[in-house]
């Protein structure tokens, strides 16, 4: 059974996460405020960041950078800037 939340990223009612995807207070906030659709958008940006910046999830500094980018993207409305990437025209 899916749960419905008000997604603060999409600014509308949407299907919520099935379980907490991220640890700690940020994880609780994601679970309560970020929909599956918004999380999917973040995962796409995260993958691009990891690949383009050659981040290693074994490196603590890289994980901190990724976490900050995630908070900026999901909660502060800042898009992820990836050097050299031009989004396809709509």
Swiss-Prot record:
Sorted UniProt keywords: Iron
Biological process, per Gene Ontology: cellular response to oxidative stress
Disulfide bonds: none
One annotated GO molecular function: iron ion binding
Keyword Iron: yes
Keyword Transmembrane helix: no
GO annotation, cellular component aspect: cytosol
InterPro entries according to UniProt: Fe_traffick_prot_YggX, Fe_traffick_prot_YggX_sf
Family: Belongs to the Fe(2+)-trafficking protein family.
Assembly, per entry: Monomer.
NCBIfam families from the UniProt entry: PRK05408.1
Record function comment: Could be a mediator in iron transactions between iron acquisition and iron-requiring processes, such as synthesis and/or repair of Fe-S clusters in biosynthetic enzymes.
Name of the protein: Probable Fe(2+)-trafficking protein
